[in-house]
């Protein structure tokens, strides 16, 4: 039985090459999230706090990046970042079905990020959208400005907040776009 992500079936196996002069072949059979002690039941992240969920998402994003052609991934620094093939990548996660990813409208993406990996933890296994950072910055700022204008220019309940969201429909086009991280894709 094939695992289901929020976007549809998740590949049963993925192969990739890693390493430099020493050739290494890695085959990941079913990149799935199984919590310790859960047998092989789907993810249940209910017992994790927000920091643990972000770490869980970040480590799965790192593994998926390697499985999809990236050669070097570092998990270090702030909880929302990875270094993939020398480029900073921001990781954002969600765990509630139907909920958007939460961001700041003023700074939706860290300044030095080349891309954002949106990790969807609402299905049986983690699923990923990989979007160019500048596209995310522009989209969030534009969407927030339009929303704010529709409210008369002032946020109704908390005027000082710049809290914004990224809805699934706004990033669906970046589903499984690992080529964005390698810089070989046209960023449409």
Regions found by a protein language model. Name each.
Residues 2-188:
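Nucleic-acid endonuclease domains
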């Amino acid at each position: 039985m094939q695992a289901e992500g929020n976007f549809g079936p998740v590949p049963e196996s993925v192969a990739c090459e890693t390493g430099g002069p020493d050739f290494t072949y890695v085959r990941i059979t079913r990149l799935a999230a199984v919590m310790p002690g859960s047998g092989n039941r789907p993810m249940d992240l209910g017992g994790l706090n927000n920091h643990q969920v972000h770490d869980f998402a970040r480590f799965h994003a790192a593994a998926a990046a390697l499985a999809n052609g990236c050669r070097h991934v570092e998990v270090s620094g702030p909880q929302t970042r990875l270094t993939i093939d020398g480029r900073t990548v921001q990781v954002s996660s969600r765990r509630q079905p139907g909920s958007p990813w939460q961001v700041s409208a003023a700074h939706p993406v860290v300044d030095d990020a080349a891309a954002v990996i949106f990790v969807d933890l609402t299905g049986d296994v983690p699923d990923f959208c990989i979007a160019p950072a500048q596209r995310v910055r522009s989209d969030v700022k534009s969407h927030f400005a339009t929303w704010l204008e529709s409210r008369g220019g002032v946020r109704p309940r908390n005027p000082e907040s710049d809290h914004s969201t990224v809805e699934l429909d706004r990033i669906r086009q970046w589903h499984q776009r690992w080529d964005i991280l390698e810089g070989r894709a046209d960023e449409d």
